């Protein structure tokens, strides 16, 4: 019943649909985030080899979320997922301070690509529940986004994939900062 009502409202008022590419280093929490958003539960996962695709609906917006494996040997394949991307979610394990430079290099190699220059960028500073986690502002400062992304909308939001903290806020920010026509 509720599903049919949302379909009718979607037809009346229009709904947005967008491709979200979720990337980041291995063990950052991408797959945990995806299934927390989709199922509202923690799904035991192994390192993603390849990709997972799920549709998450939030406030009349369909997010077709592509979670692509982050192991070093898979990163050269990321570019094959760039076409038609509306927003990039880059997930960072904010407690892994020793991997921040590597994460920064990978992020800039992605957003430096022609196909990605007009996408909005959300960085989820994940694992905020851990003691040594960098705060979102620290992550933002380290990544130097304000200095380097003058013409691209971006935001850093603290998240905790296990509790769901920051996840809805991230989807809301993407929805409010993209210009996708309603269907």
From Swiss-Prot:
Other comment: Present with 1240 molecules/cell in log phase SD medium.
Family as reported in the entry's similarity comment: Belongs to the small GTPase superfamily. Arf family.
Residues annotated as binding GTP: 24-31, 67-71, 126-129
Subcellular location: Golgi apparatus
Annotated GO CC locations: cellular bud neck; cellular bud tip; cytoplasm; cytosol; Golgi apparatus; plasma membrane
A Pfam match: Arf
Residue ranges that the Swiss-Prot or TrEMBL entry lists as coiled coil: none
Keywords for this protein: ER-Golgi transport, Golgi apparatus, GTP-binding, Lipoprotein, Myristate, Nucleotide-binding, Protein transport, Transport
Gene responsible for this protein: ARF3
Cleaved signal peptide residues: none
Subunit field text: Interacts with RUD3.
Protein task: GTP-binding protein involved in protein trafficking; may modulate vesicle budding and uncoating within the Golgi apparatus.
GO molecular function annotations of the record: enzyme activator activity; GTP binding; GTPase activity; mRNA binding
InterPro entries linked to this entry: Arf6, P-loop_NTPase, Small_GTP-bd, Small_GTPase_ARF, Small_GTPase_ARF/SAR
Source organism: Saccharomyces cerevisiae (strain ATCC 204508 / S288c)
Name under which the protein is recorded: ADP-ribosylation factor 3
Main subcellular localisation: Golgi
Covalent lipidation (N-myristoyl glycine), chain numbering: 2
Gene Ontology biological process terms from the UniProt entry: actin cortical patch localization; actin filament bundle assembly; cellular bud site selection; endocytosis; intracellular protein transport; invasive filamentous growth; invasive growth in response to glucose limitation; positive regulation of phosphatidylinositol biosynthetic process
